[in-house]
Each structure stands twice: as structure tokens, then as C-alpha cells.
Design a protein with these regions (language model features):
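Short beta-strand->loop
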Residues: 123-140, 195-198, 231-249
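An extracytoplasmic/periplasmic, membrane-proximal ligand-sensing/linker region
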Residues: 43-54, 59-70, 250, 256-257, ...
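N-terminal secretory signal peptides that target proteins for export/translocation
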Residues: 1-18
């Protein structure tokens, strides 16, 4: 009997220990698996040492980038990342920078954003500015495309523009290309190239406005807030032009980032812009863009532009 009990104790006790060890290892495996999956998820987001910022080109892109310095300084402080500027040559170059993951944060035109987002859903809008009322600009987070001609010229009606020279801005522009080719062509009942004698691209809304004033083009499609920029620099006035057509309200320029950046970085980028109204050093920047505050935006806010793009693409 003693031998039997010894036999039982000798072999039964290790089995109990083994069972406990199996349970412990199972728990550890599950725990490590969970932690591993969390680490894997964290590893999939991007956490670069520096962030590259870009804007769509204007007449004075270098000077405008300098005006963004209080913004980028704040972004650098909040994110803990060095902020680098990318100097664009066209609307398309900013998009290519985003698609290639060279650019992390950017200011796009609405049409440019829709094009970029259709190619890569990770390019995500998060904010825009709410404009103050100006010479031609209305108050709020929207603007209009406007067809202007020089006051005192013979071009005082849409019909008078037949066979004349019209200025567009850039193929990626909303008010300077998309709206004219989709919304305005409904007014004239034909393509721009059939109605006008010549269609030219000037490169920016500011250059289009100046080209009208100087008589280099007979008319031009410009953004209302960009026209105001030229007026504020003393290169034009509202009294110097005829307004021949206005588009529907267009959502303002989208501020975007690549949503593959880590969540904490994206949150700090959003905070950079949404909180600008409370930053004294940003007043000059807000005054320059004629805004009191930034407002949050999402992809659906630009569905109007998507509909216009679809209509344009269907005609090509």
C-alpha cells in the first residue's frame, strides 16, 4: 500500500504541475499575441522624424510660404517634428508629392483634392479656413468662381466674349478650370474651345486677374478670394472689372494630410490649425488669408466637386 501511494504521488503531482504550466503558457501566449497585434498595428502607422508641408502655387509662392511660418512653428512644437517646406511647380506636383509619400501635409484646391483622393484614399481633408467678407469674397468656408473682363472694354456680356481670349488658371484648378468646363459650358451650350477664340492657362488666379487688367486676355475665370488678394496688393480694384458670371459656392481650399501618419501626429496637426485663432503669433497669418478661424472638414464636404468631376470626365 505504501509503495502504491508512493507510485501515485510520484506520477500524479507532476501531471498537475504540467496542467498548471499549460494554463499559464496559454494565458501568456494569448497575452503576447494581443500585445504583438497591438505593436503590429502601431508599426503600420508612419512616424517620420520630419513632416513635409506644401501649398498649391500662387503668384508669390515663396512669400506665401513665409507667411505660413507661425503655423509651421506651431506644428513643429505640437508634433515634436521638424517641418520642411516643399516648393511646388504646379498643382499636380503637390499631388505627386502626396502620392509618393514625400509630402505629408498640404493645402490643395478642391478639385486637386478630389483628384488626389480618387487616386489614394489615404489623402484626407481635415480642415479649411472660414473667410472674412472681402471685395468679392463672401463670408464663410466657401468661395465662388467668377468670370471677369476689364471695365471699359467691349466685353460686357457673355455673348460679347465669343471668339475672344479667355484665361484659365491651371488644369487642376476648381474655379479656374473645372467650373468653367462643367458649369459655365451649360450657360453657353458648348465647350470652351468652341465658344472662345483661344483658351490659355496663366498659372494662377492672381496672374489671370492681372492679365485681364493689362489686356493680355479678354476675360478670365478666377476665385473670388484670390481676386481679393490682387486688390489688397493694389494691382486691381473691384471697379476695374466687369463680373459676367458667378459659380455656385465652392468649399474652400482643403488642408490635408496622409492618414497613414500615426493618430497622435494627425491629432496634433489638426490642433495646429483648429486652435490658430487662440495663438497671438498666428494673427498675421490669419489676417493674410482673411480668416478668423479654421473649421473642421471631411471628405463628404467636397461631393459637389466630385459630381462636377464626374460630369467633366463623362464628356471627355
Amino acid at each position: 500500500m505504501i509503495m502504491k501511494n508512493l507510485f501515485i504521488n510520484r506520477y500524479w503531482c507532476p501531471n498537475a504541475v504540467i496542467k498548471k504550466l499549460i494554463t499559464v503558457f496559454s494565458i501568456l501566449t494569448i497575452s503576447f499575441g494581443f500585445v504583438g497585434s497591438q505593436l503590429a498595428m502601431a508599426a503600420t502607422c508612419e512616424n517620420p522624424d520630419a513632416l513635409t508641408f506644401a501649398i498649391i502655387p500662387t503668384e508669390e509662392t515663396v512669400a506665401e510660404l513665409q507667411l505660413y511660418k507661425p503655423v509651421t512653428d506651431r506644428m513643429e512644437e505640437l508634433t515634436g517634428k521638424k517641418i520642411q517646406f516643399f516648393m511646388p511647380t504646379s498643382y499636380a506636383s503637390v499631388v505627386e508629392g502626396l502620392l509618393s509619400k514625400f509630402v505629408d501635409v498640404a493645402v490643395l484646391g478642391p478639385y486637386t483634392y478630389v483628384i488626389a483622393n480618387s487616386k489614394d484614399k489615404s489623402i484626407e481633408v481635415f480642415a479649411t479656413y472660414a473667410k472674412r467678407p472681402g471685395h468679392m469674397q463672401e463670408e464663410g468656408p466657401g468661395y465662388r468662381g467668377v468670370l471677369i473682363s476689364k471695365r471699359g472694354s467691349k466685353f460686357t456680356t457673355i455673348d460679347s466674349l465669343k471668339g475672344s481670349i479667355v484665361g484659365l488658371t491651371d488644369p487642376g484648378s476648381t474655379s479656374g478650370n473645372l467650373m468653367p468646363r462643367v458649369a459655365f459650358t451649360k450657360v453657353i451650350g458648348m465647350d470652351l474651345e468652341k465658344f472662345f477664340g483661344k483658351v490659355v492657362y496663366t498659372g494662377s488666379h492672381e496672374l489671370s486677374t492681372v492679365a485681364v487688367i493689362q489686356g493680355k486676355v479678354d476675360s478670365a475665370f478666377v476665385a473670388s478670394h484670390r481676386f481679393d488678394n490682387v486688390v489688397n496688393k493694389g494691382e486691381a480694384s473691384l471697379d476695374a472689372v466687369n463680373i459676367l458670371w458667378k459659380s455656385a459656392v465652392i468649399p474652400q481650399d482643403p488642408f490635408v494630410y496622409r492618414n497613414t501618419l500615426c493618430d497622435n501626429i494627425k491629432a496634433k496637426i489638426r490642433e495646429t490649425f483648429i486652435g490658430l485663432k487662440d495663438v497671438p503669433s498666428a494673427k498675421k497669418f490669419l489676417d493674410n488669408v482673411k480668416s478668423n478661424t479654421f473649421v473642421e472638414m471631411n471628405s463628404d464636404d467636397y461631393n459637389l466637386i466630385r459630381d462636377l468631376k464626374k460630369a467633366k470626365d463623362a464628356r471627355n
